[in-house]
Amino acid sequence: MIQRESRLVVADNSGAKEVLVIGILGGTRRSHVNIGDIVVVTVKSGSGTVKKHDVLKAVIVRTKKGLRRKNGSYIKFDDNAVVLLKEDLNIIGTRIFGPVVRELSDKKFSKIVSLAQLVL
């Protein structure tokens, strides 16, 4: 379960390696997020176009908790990962590393699905 103060891996080539969740968008009482939700993060390690201590928005693309599909199956991953976003909700990087779920295209992130190496 991803909540505030959770550390996540970055799944794009924006330059950041690890981020820390400092906020959850979508209401004041939300305590945890799932795949496809937008969070506010700060960069903890990495170099490149984004620097340490930058505050950005990100979308969750993989979780250890997993995602339940309508047919009853679950998809779980080995890590919790995000893709960093600009203020207008476009992605910063040009490549997406690792698998993502196809449900992201239903949540208006079809660019992430098209750039991903593997779509489950």
Swiss-Prot record:
One of its GO terms (molecular function) is large ribosomal subunit rRNA binding. Keywords: Ribonucleoprotein, Ribosomal protein, RNA-binding, rRNA-binding. Pfam families: Ribosomal_L14. Signal peptide: none annotated. Disulfide bonds: none annotated. GO terms for biological process: translation. The keyword Membrane does not apply. It comes from the Bacteria. InterPro entries: Ribosomal_uL14, Ribosomal_uL14_bac-type, Ribosomal_uL14_CS, Ribosomal_uL14_sf. NCBIfam families: rplN_bact (TIGR01067). Belongs to the universal ribosomal protein uL14 family. Binds to 23S rRNA. Forms part of two intersubunit bridges in the 70S ribosome. Part of the 50S ribosomal subunit. Forms a cluster with proteins L3 and L19. In the 70S ribosome, L14 and L19 interact and together make contacts with the 16S rRNA in bridges B5 and B8. This is Large ribosomal subunit protein uL14.
